[in-house]
């Protein structure tokens, strides 16, 4: 299934990082904080925005922003471009 966000929105895929305690115990998903890093999967219409984001960029976003959706058993978030705080550059 292909999803294209409308307006100044992005479709992002959260980057899950494995969390361990200092003792080396891996925390289950229910104990982890919501991720704030993601990879951009699709871009809506950003013509009126001064943001330079393209598919494949990695971004940091506001913790509780966007709408979570599930596509073919994968978790995604549709988010307003204003909720993107930073672009991660390699």
Curated annotation (Swiss-Prot):
SMART domains: Cpn10 (SM00883). Disulfide bonds: none annotated. GO terms for cellular component: cytoplasm. The keyword Acyltransferase does not apply. The keyword Cytoplasm applies. GO terms for biological process: chaperone cofactor-dependent protein refolding. GO terms for molecular function: ATP binding; metal ion binding; protein folding chaperone; protein-folding chaperone binding; unfolded protein binding. Keywords: Chaperone, Cytoplasm. It is found in: Cytoplasm. Heptamer of 7 subunits arranged in a ring. Interacts with the chaperonin GroEL. NCBIfam families: PRK00364.2-2, PRK14533.1. Together with the chaperonin GroEL, plays an essential role in assisting protein folding. The GroEL-GroES system forms a nano-cage that allows encapsulation of the non-native substrate proteins and provides a physical environment optimized to promote and accelerate protein folding. GroES binds to the apical surface of the GroEL ring, thereby capping the opening of the GroEL channel. Belongs to the GroES chaperonin family. HAMAP family: CH10. This is Co-chaperonin GroES. It comes from Thermosipho melanesiensis (strain DSM 12029 / CIP 104789 / BI429). The lineage of its organism: Bacteria, Thermotogati, Thermotogota, Thermotogae, Thermotogales.
């Amino acid at each position: 299934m292909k999803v294209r966000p409308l307006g100044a929105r992005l479709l992002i895929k959260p980057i899950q990082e494995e969390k361990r305690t200092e003792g080396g115990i891996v925390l289950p998903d229910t104990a982890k904080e919501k991720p704030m890093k993601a990879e951009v999967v699709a871009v809506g219409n950003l013509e009126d925005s001064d943001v330079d984001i393209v598919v494949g960029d990695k971004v940091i976003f506001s913790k509780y922003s966007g709408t979570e959706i599930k596509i073919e058993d994968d978790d995604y978030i549709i988010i307003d471009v204003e909720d993107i705080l930073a672009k991660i550059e390699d």
